[in-house]
Every structure is written in structure tokens, then in C-alpha cells.
Amino acid sequence: MRKVILVSALLCGMAVVAGAQTKLSGKLTCAKPGVSETGGDGAQMIMFQKANCTWTTPFAIDGSKPGRTVDASIGDMAGSTGRAHGYSTSVMDNGDSTFVRYEGTSQMKKDGSATNKGTWRYVRGTGKFRGISGSGTFKGEAAADGSSWADVSGHYSLAKGKMKAK
């Protein structure tokens, strides 16, 4: 249970597509992730996670919106506190992709749900998103069943000659 909450909570804050410091915001929803637990002593767990996500409130950059998004991370949980870092890949509706690195923390509640927060930054893009840069924050929740959502906000810049978000 703890591993699913950590995975879901922290994976949600990632995959964003991000001129000159243009603001962006959206809402990302992730299904229950697949988890491979590497072991632990009962007080701490270390896990590899992968989740499929959808932008329920997408943003647009140069007319393209994010579609299929996959998050992969490594996390650890000690008691009710967790942390994770990973990467999120979004395939835009034009076929190009963006890649985000994220990290964050999670606090599990007694009912098995959790709150999460963290930061993200673009590491690269393909096609018209080549040279993308930017960063921001995420904050969200995970349900006891492992599904999760996060509000994502921040800013981005496209490489010289690229158009801004709509």
C-alpha cells in the first residue's frame, strides 16, 4: 500500500511541455503504477515505478497538446514519508516529445491516501521542442487505490525561432 501511494503521488507531478519564460499550467492524472520493490526491512522500502498518465487539463505549445505520458522513477518510503525522483516523457499530438526530470516528497495519511509536492524541469525535447527549457512545481494527491493527480505549473522557453504557448 505504501509503495503504491508513493509511486502515484510523486509520478503525477512530472511530464509537462514547456520564447521567453512563458507560463504554463495543467492537471495530470495517473493510473495506479506498476511497482517493483527491491526489498526493505519493513521500516523502509525502495521501489522502481512506472505509470501511464493523461493530461486531463492540458496546455498547448505552438498548437500542440500533450497526449500519452509515461512516468518512471525510483522512490523510497520510510514510515509515512516518501521521496522519489524520475523522468516523464510526453508524446505531443504532433508526434514530437518532451522529457522532464522531477523530484518530490509524499506524506501518507492514515486512510492510505497521500499528499505530494515537488519540482520539475525540462531536460530535452524532439522536433519543434528541441532545445526546450523550463521548470516549475507540482502539488497533488494520491488515492488509497494508487491513482493520483497533480496540478502542474511553471514556465518554459522554446529554442530560438519557436512559437509560444496558447
How would you describe each model-predicted region?
Residues 1-4:
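Positively charged n-region of N-terminal signal peptides that target proteins for export
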Residues 9-18:
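Hydrophobic h-region of N-terminal signal peptides that target proteins for export
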Residues 19-166:
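Beta-strand-enriched cores of mature, soluble protein domains
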